[in-house]
Regions:
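Cap/lid segment of the alpha/beta-hydrolase catalytic domain
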Residues: 437-462, 475-577
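C-terminal subdomain of alpha/beta-hydrolase-fold enzymes, centered on the catalytic histidine
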Residues: 543, 547-550, 615-837
Length: 837
């Protein structure tokens, strides 16, 4: 202790000596005084606190200080997110005195108008004196009544996407939203769906949908319908008043002032869309505004939805929800659940600004992430790979048959069935089962740690029915028959193979053999055991989707059985002769093809995408995206009587259907559209598809088929659709026409077949024939019209076109000679039409 104070005394003495040696003490104070004087002379400007009310009344005040006597030029600007910088007040010139000077300047008329809005705004002043420049800035305090937001209900803010105020709509709307995602660095998108059970819709028994099957997804559907409740846009008239892009004129999505816009954040481009009100809602207050993609969203894409400058049917502006205004207008609040999302929304506004969409004009804006291709096909692809491994084929991308054929057993052989069926063969074939209950109709996947289906201990015995035409059995040396598998209709059965005009005509007239199996998941047995229970309680919906994927595998095994040299052709039932005595196989096993009609034309999409064997598929009256198809189908009324009472809230119904789409994507073409033709899944060949459609189809919406064609990159025949049939429709928008020099066309294609308008049959005036074009609203066509759904299956033109397509290096010809394609009972003569009274 003494040593420390001793050293301190020595240091103090040394410091005193240094001060004396340094000379007069007055030198240092003089220098400091000069520096202080110089600092005091520095030019400064400060914008004084200002509110909207004070600015509108008195203008803006600034405090200026600097060298006394100096002349200062002041200029005033204000800035906001949208405008950048604008003049706030006229410039002023002042002379400074010894004290700081407060200057008050009135705001310009434009500045007062801008300040009257609730947009966050900065008041900026620039002072210039000689070479000195000074700047000052202050945020404008927004105190007008319109900018003082009423409190919002945040009691459900942790589970509800609250920006549209759930008390005015639905907890999960707007939908889809990245509010319902979490980060997952192991997923292809970097995200994972995260629906809380408290947010999910409930059925009439107050049972919420369990989100576990949804939360495995890495994003929303690639064909996801967008839903939001906008009070004031409750009717078709309200929609029309906003000039949204309508279904009949899709090109309007790109209009500069379009009020509903969806932006691809990667490309900055607008997504083609159409906008409509839910026409199925009987209560306008429960009618959702619906936005649909006209071509599927990019896999793994992030999109921003922006609604702006909305009005009601009378032209009255609709004020944005207060919850969203906290973000749009940057209104301060101490509420944590609001503040924690500010950074996210600022990013949205910056992206929209690049797209020239003003923040101040927004009614609502939000974002969502789209699922990856892998998300949709990975389970079914895993099942395919594991199943084919059991028969010795692990290299399926080379389109070469390897390993053994699946086991099968013929159970019945019928000869001389009718004039077009010489032999009908039925039996069963063995398929690895990946469902509980040994693939019974109420089974579902048992998933492993990788979220992939585990194989059951027992195999599944799938049924088959095959028809052989007379040409394959007659004569001493009958031709080998081209094999194709047939996909049946809605909740149908394999036995439709014997009765479908397309199978009967293709086999009998074009030397083919057709086989079918029940498309389990949506086969006849599933109608009451799977579909109806799911409509009553969507917690069971995964059973339908899981079973559909098993059904895809069954179809792939049947095609291998037809394609393999050691397959069906090894049984006498598939050999020439009497069907019992061994003979020569009637099957040409070099190739195999797919033909599906109605539901088979739908389910043929994912089956084609996964197929290692058939690379050419004909999809008749097909389409995709069941959430779009259902309410637009004449079949829906049968199921709506079950679904609607089960989910009585009209606003929740379209949400429930769009939620199911996220699961349906694992087993229907909407989830495979990006990989069906080119860009196939791993270890899979590329494919070509022809889509043969009926104009005005009552069961499978033409609009959904058009989206499918755009997404898959199909082309259509030069004639397209007769303008006289659909004068107000921008038909086949963004679907390229096949040029004359491109025929025979070997790529993927779509062709509409027209059975003519609704009219009297000239050969029988007591009979109505023909149909109108489909309604633009999301409802089924007029039931009074004739349903053309079956026309392409029995018409000579489509059958001939499919025949040339279902060949090695197959093609479609210009069968309609550059004109719209017409079914057999319509010649295009509008002048001879006899109207229905």
């Amino acid at each position: 202790m003494h040593s420390f104070f001793g050293r301190l005394a020595i240091l103090a003495a040394a410091f005193s000596f240094m001060l004396v040696a340094a000379g007069p003490a007055s030198a240092t104070p003089v220098a400091s005084s000069a520096t202080a004087s110089k600092k005091q002379a520095k030019l400064k400007v400060k914008v004084l606190p200002a509110s909207q009310a004070s600015l509108l009344k008195s203008g803006v005040k600034v405090r200026v200080s600097g060298r006394p006597g100096s002349r200062v030029k002041l200029s005033f600007r204000s800035s906001s997110f949208d405008e950048g910088s604008r003049t706030l007040a006229k410039p002023r010139k002042i002379r400074l005195g010894k004290k700081a000077r407060v200057v008050k300047v009135p705001a310009t008329a434009g500045a007062r108008a801008a300040a009257s809005t609730c947009a966050a705004r900065s008041l900026n002043a620039l002072a210039v004196s000689g070479k000195q420049r000074a700047r000052g800035s202050r945020a404008l305090t927004r105190n007008l009544a319109d900018c003082r937001l009423a409190p919002i209900d945040i009691t459900q803010a942790q589970v509800c996407e609250f920006i549209a105020q759930p008390d005015q709509g639905n907890c999960m709307m707007p939908f889809p939203s990245d509010f319902y995602t979490r980060k997952d660095r192991n997923s292809p998108t970097g995200k994972r769906i995260s629906f809380p059970v408290a947010a999910m819709p409930k059925n009439r028994n107050n049972v919420s949908i369990d989100p576990k099957n949804w939360n495995a997804s890495d994003g929303f559907s690639q064909g996801q319908g967008i839903l939001v409740k906008v009070p004031g846009i409750d009717t078709a008239e309200d929609v029309a008043a906003n000039d949204f892009a309508p279904l009949q004129t899709l090109s309007r999505y790109a209009e500069r002032n379009q009020r509903a816009v969806v932006i691809n954040t990667k490309t900055g481009e607008r997504q083609p869309i159409w906008v409509e009100i839910d026409a199925n809602a009987t209560d306008p207050d429960k009618a959702a505004l619906m936005i649909s993609p006209a071509t599927n969203f990019d896999q793994k894409g992030r999109y921003i939805v922006a609604l702006r400058n909305l009005v009601d049917a009378d032209g009255n502006s609709l004020e944005a929800p207060n919850a969203f205004r906290y973000y749009r207008d940057a209104i301060p609040t101490s509420t944590g659940v609001i503040n924690q999302r500010r950074g996210h929304f600022e990013g949205i506004f910056k992206t929209l600004r690049k797209a020239k969409i003003k923040r101040s004009e927004l009614y609502l804006a939000w974002d969502f992430t789209v699922a990856s291709n892998e998300n949709n096909y990975r389970r079914a692809l895993h099942m395919r790979d594991e199943a084919f491994k059991t028969i010795g084929d692990t290299s399926m991308g080379d389109n070469v048959v390897q390993g053994a054929a699946p086991d099968f057993n013929v159970t019945s052989v019928e000869d001389n069935v009718d004039s077009k069926i010489a032999r009908r063969v039925r039996g069963f074939f063995t398929v690895p089962c990946f469902m509980t209950k040994d693939c019974a109709s109420t089974g579902e996947f048992k998933l492993d740690a990788r979220d992939l289906p585990e194989r059951s201990d027992n195999d599944y015995q799938a049924n088959f029915e095959c028809i052989i035409p007379p040409v394959g059995l007659e004569g001493a040396n009958p031709p080998k028959l081209r094999p194709f598998i047939y996909g049946h209709g809605l909740f149908g059965l394999a036995l439709e193979n014997s009765f479908s005009p397309v199978t009967r005509d293709l086999t009998a007239d074009y030397e083919s053999i057709s086989c079918a199996t029940d498309e389990i998941g949506m086969a006849g047995i599933d109608r009451f055991t799977v579909a109806v229970p799911a409509l009553q309680d969507m917690n069971k919906f995964n059973q339908l989707v899981d079973r559909l994927q098993q059904g895809l595998l069954n179809g792939l095994f049947l095609s291998r059985l037809m394609h393999h040299p050691d397959g069906l052709g090894t049984d006498p039932a598939f050999q020439d002769g009497d069907g019992v005595t061994p003979g020569e196989s009637v099957i040409d096993t070099d190739e195999v093809y797919y033909v599906g009609a109605s539901q088979g034309g739908i389910m043929g999409g994912p089956m084609t995408a996964l197929s290692p064997d058939f690379t050419q598929s004909a999809l008749i009256v097909g389409g995709m995206n069941y959430s779009t198809l259902l309410t637009r189908s004449s079949n829906w009324s049968t199921f709506a009587v079950i679904f609607n009472p089960s989910y009585p809230d009209e606003l929740s119904r379209p949400l429930v259907l769009n939620l199911t789409q996220m699961l349906w994507d694992r087993g229907e073409p909407n989830g495979y559209a990006h990989v069906t033709t080119d860009n196939p899944p791993p270890n899979t060949p590329a494919h070509n598809v022809t889509l043969q459609l009926a104009l005005g189809d009552h069961q499978v919406s033409n609009f959904a088929a058009d989206v499918m064609a755009r997404t898959m990159g199909m082309k259509t025949n030069a004639g397209g659709i007769d303008d006289r049939r659909w004068p107000d429709y921008e038909d086949l928008w963004n679907i390229p026409r096949i040029g004359a020099s491109e025929y025979p066309y070997r790529g993927s294609s779509m062709v509409y077949w027209d059975g003519g308008p609704y009219r009297l049959n000239p050969d029988n005036l007591s009979q109505d024939i023909g149909t109108g074009v489909p309604p633009y609203a999301n409802v089924a066509p007029d039931g009074q019209w004739e349903d053309p759904h079956g026309a392409p299956r029995g018409a000579s033109g489509p059958i001939s076109m499919m025949n040339t397509f279902l060949q090695p290096n197959g093609f479609i010809a210009d069968a309609c000679n550059g004109e719209p394609c017409r079914a057999d009972d319509w010649d295009g003569d509008f002048d001879s039409i006899i109207p229905v009274p």
